Amino acid sequence: MTETRFSKDHEWVRLDGDVATVGITDHAQSALGDVVFVELPETGRHVDAGEACAVVESVKAASDVYAPLAGTVTEANGALADDPGMVNAQAESGAWFFRMTLDDRAAFDALLTADDYQAFLATL
């Protein structure tokens, strides 16, 4: 069963078994504008929760993408390098940034639910 959670840094995490898929939220891509470049983390890299591990550049700004959880990157979405505009079109589906195995499954449960994330957005 897959479940999606969110960070206050506007990343989403979809957990499927032991694998977490990470991307940026629709809110984040909308704030960035047209995405023109994406830099992804290397496979095999260990990241800590809150660590900047990817970069997304738009016509407006460049922004770090933070690891919402600690773990090891197992795959990066190379399609984003060829077509960074996917981030705008499919932010919370096909335009995932990387997949990782988690150091601590319980940390996933501490992230925001969809309802909690929407409530957080309302405070911005």
UniProtKB/Swiss-Prot annotation:
GO CC terms of this entry: cytosol; glycine cleavage complex
Keywords: Lipoyl
DNA-binding recorded as keyword: no
Residues of the Lipoyl-binding domain: 19-101
Cofactor(s) annotated in UniProt: (R)-lipoate
UniProt xrefs under Pfam families: GCV_H
UniProt entry tagged with the keyword Plastid: no
Modified residues (N6-lipoyllysine): 60
GO biological process: glycine decarboxylation via glycine cleavage system
Cofactor note: Binds 1 lipoyl cofactor covalently.
Subunit structure as annotated in this protein's UniProt entry: The glycine cleavage system is composed of four proteins: P, T, L and H.
Family membership: Belongs to the GcvH family.
PANTHER family per UniProt: GLYCINE CLEAVAGE SYSTEM H PROTEIN (PTHR11715), GLYCINE CLEAVAGE SYSTEM H PROTEIN-RELATED (PTHR11715:SF3)
Primary role: The glycine cleavage system catalyzes the degradation of glycine. The H protein shuttles the methylamine group of glycine from the P protein to the T protein.
Name the record gives this protein: Glycine cleavage system H protein
Source species of the chain: Acidiphilium cryptum (strain JF-5)
Lineage: Bacteria, Pseudomonadati, Pseudomonadota, Alphaproteobacteria, Acetobacterales
